[in-house]
Amino acid sequence: MKVILKENVENLGHIGDIVKVAPGYARNYLIPRNFAIEATEKNAKALEHAKRQLEYKRNKVLEQARLLVAKIEGLSLSISHQAGEEGKLFGSVTNMELAELLKAQGVEIDRKKIVLAEPIKHVGEFTAVVKVHPEVAANLKVVVTKAE
């Protein structure tokens, strides 16, 4: 019996694969647990349609992410912190502060998507990576100055 997988099934296949299985395995395990549907012409067409819609949405989200990356890379954030004589900050610049500065610039990003290679604890220029999408990331320029 041929079935179309709706979930990834170990040792069988991935979502959307059409696989041949024993009729009992399909009727008693895969179909009742909603892991698969019977591979009919109608179901195959519905699967193709769903794949096209998913691909369209994925491309649209990716395009929006690329536009956001272009906007972020055009920005340079300036932040002033209290610092000692040698330029060492009292505390550090966190991704939460960077997220608030981005929000003030009109770019709303979750703080967890801002990755600092190392904590910013000195005055100077730094680069933070903003993971906008799993496939797209932006480099954000951060300038830290000493507060007077």
Curated annotation (Swiss-Prot):
Coiled coil: none annotated. One of its GO terms (biological process) is translation. Keywords: Ribonucleoprotein, Ribosomal protein, RNA-binding, rRNA-binding. InterPro entries: Ribosomal_bL9 (IPR000244), Ribosomal_bL9/RNase_H1_N (IPR009027), Ribosomal_bL9_bac/chp (IPR020594), Ribosomal_bL9_C (IPR020069), Ribosomal_bL9_C_sf (IPR036791), Ribosomal_bL9_N (IPR020070), Ribosomal_bL9_N_sf (IPR036935). PROSITE patterns: RIBOSOMAL_L9 (PS00651). GO terms for cellular component: cytosolic large ribosomal subunit. One of its GO terms (molecular function) is rRNA binding. Binds to the 23S rRNA. Belongs to the bacterial ribosomal protein bL9 family. This is Large ribosomal subunit protein bL9. It comes from Geobacter sulfurreducens (strain ATCC 51573 / DSM 12127 / PCA).
